Amino acid sequence: CFTADRVIFPQDDHIDIDGAHFGVLSLPGHSAGHIGFVTPDGAAYVGDCLIDQHEIDAAKLPTSMFIAKDLDSKAALRATDYPAYIIAHKQVVTDRAELSALIDSNIAFIHRKERELLDDLTDGMTFSDWIYAFCQRENIRTRQELKFSIVERNFTNFTDWLTDTGKVRVERDFCAKRYYHG
């Protein structure tokens, strides 16, 4: 457990640290209150709102609590204009065309995984059946509880989004949830 040095509220559009003025960007999706910062020299640090192409290529699923909000936050970055964007803790993008392509790639990644998960679903599957089919296709073979809990959390967030959008429907069969194409 830790104590925050400072709390940033949803309505805050900036913070001042030791006399330096930082803008605050609301970028929910990756996490509920995910934010980015604009440095005093104008660079936008967008954190995990965007990931680089290498991470996209290696990822089994996006790490996102709220897929719909994540898609909105990614798309909203198109309307911003900063001289540099710091992406997912490591890449710096200064070219607008490169940023636009990276946004497109991040959004396409989510929609590709959407199609794959829908392909994995056989109507009437339980959650356990569905995630098992996903893990088989993605060749996820871990016995480590922590690693699997991350896969399970990301899969759950994704299935919730598919349900919210009507692409999947859930029916109760006694004590089991069964999933069907919407």
PLM feature segments, named:
Residues C1-I17:
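Active-site HxH/HxHxD metal-binding segment of metal-dependent hydrolases
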